[in-house]
Amino acid sequence: MYKAVRMFNYKDGLGLEQEALKGVCEVEEHVCSTEDDIIKYCQDADAVMGIFEPLTARVINSLPKLKLIACKSMGYNYVDLEAAKARGISVTHLRSAFSIDVADYVTACILAHNKRLFAYDRSVRRDKKWDY
């Protein structure tokens, strides 16, 4: 059976992944924020799932069984793609993850900045009055 390690904590997600991969892949969760954490907890992993964990050449070359890096984000700039390619390791990512949410947030921030909402908010909180 294959082994995957999820290197981050997300409420309720682990159970869903374990259920979806039942009988095919054992899924464990170990929060890894450093290269040493990843090397320690993912030593026998066939696959790792990450968000922003540092998957450097050192890390990739220290995981002998690694076959797949699954980035659960749009970006994958934290993965050394050359090191992964040299080892024949596939790298995946969620190409359109959160794109609508991010676009909504950026649009709201642009409007708030343009209308000076942040400055007005600070002024009202500081002076305790609305005088505009």
Predicted feature descriptions by range:
Residues 1-45:
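N-terminal glycine-/charge-rich "phosphate-binding" loop or analogous flexible N-terminal tail
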Residues 50-51, 67-73, 93:
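Short beta-strand elements of ligand-binding domains
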Residues 54-67, 80-83:
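Rossmann-fold NAD(P) dinucleotide-binding segment
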Residues 77-89:
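Rossmann-fold NAD(P)-binding glycine/threonine-rich loop
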Residues 87-89, 95-132:
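Phosphate-binding beta-alpha-beta segment of Rossmann-like dinucleotide-binding domains, i.e.
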Residues 27-33, 49-51, 125-132:
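Short gly/ser/thr-rich secondary-structure transition/capping motifs
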Residues 41-47, 64-67:
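Short acidic/histidine-rich motifs immediately flanking catalytic phosphotransfer sites
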